[in-house]
């Protein structure tokens, strides 16, 4: 994997209308999930003092927020070294993709009977802009649309527990798409599979929608296993 610029956690000062611990937790969790945590080899260390300065609060709510994030598996404390963002091994990532495939497959099955036609149209609209130009010229935009597509299917399943469970997986799942899209014309194949999934949803074919989503996501696991430069 090519070395890239060291990622920096991006946070903004907090307002004080709610618990500072809760606000710090939400801000840090959002910032971590938006980072490219697999984009460079160096471990990502979080500095309490710097976070305190950036968020405009004391170190106590920062420390409490990091404790909550450690309990959820987003960060880990290393004695005498500090707090680090958690990165998974290739085996763990593949296992997480398998779990995601099962959860998103169920969400697609539910969405086929519970979501509205307008919601399916909005899902299809995510890909309208990619019809006329090569995907190779729009990879950043397509990457964002791909993320939105999978998150939307999860939400259309109308199951809050699945939404919650996939949130903690998503930080690692989203990082794999960069690996996947570089290989075997995967981006072009991906959009074709997305459109087939949307077709099954619009047809209210729950069995087919679940099958296509599961196969599509498990294909990502195969790509990661074959090409992913993650720790073993």
Specify the residue positions occupied by each region the protein language model found.
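Hydrophobic residues in alpha-helical segments
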Residues: 32, 111, 134, 201-202
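A generic short alpha-helical patch detector that favors 3-5-residue windows
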Residues: 20, 95, 99, 115-122, ...
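Short linear motifs at protein or domain termini
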Residues: 1-105, 109, 113, 226-232
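A ubiquitous short alpha-helical element
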Residues: 89-93, 108-115, 133-137, 157-158, ...
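C-terminal regulatory/effector modules of DNA-binding transcriptional regulators
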Residues: 2-4, 183-232
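Conserved amphipathic alpha-helical segments that form helical-bundle/coiled-coil interaction surfaces
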Residues: 117-178, 192-199, 208-219
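A short secondary-structure junction motif
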Residues: 31, 35, 39, 130, ...
